[in-house]
Amino acid sequence: MDYEFKKNTLEGTYHANFSMGHEAMGRWLVEDVAKNTDLLAEIYKHIALIKNTQDEWTLSGKVMTLVLSDQEVIVQENALFEQSDEEFEEDIHMYDDECISVCGLEDFETMLQSWEAFINRF
């Protein structure tokens, strides 16, 4: 998973560009996390709790839903999360890389640390 963070200094907005298949991670960072360091601390806490367990933690944001497990992290649009599995299978043809992303827990934690370091610089 490759990514690049940018800040538009004229507008004060942040951008997170991710490699193909992980675009939803960027949307989640910009739209749901932004500069919320309290939220980042809460996510780090749950990452530590979930490691080496089979627990799962879900966080519904304004636009996206984050699902943490010991194996993977899923970020998806709230509308997709609210669908049942059966509805999801029927609508899979509408899949869009910007709607859902999956990565490993360690990669996610590393990316989150990079985002935090980036926003703290500005």
UniProtKB/Swiss-Prot annotation:
Residue ranges the record marks as coiled coil: none
Family the entry assigns: Belongs to the UPF0231 family.
Protein name: UPF0231 protein VF_2154
Organism lineage string: Bacteria, Pseudomonadati, Pseudomonadota, Gammaproteobacteria, Vibrionales
Tree of life domain: Bacteria
Pfam families from the UniProt entry: UPF0231
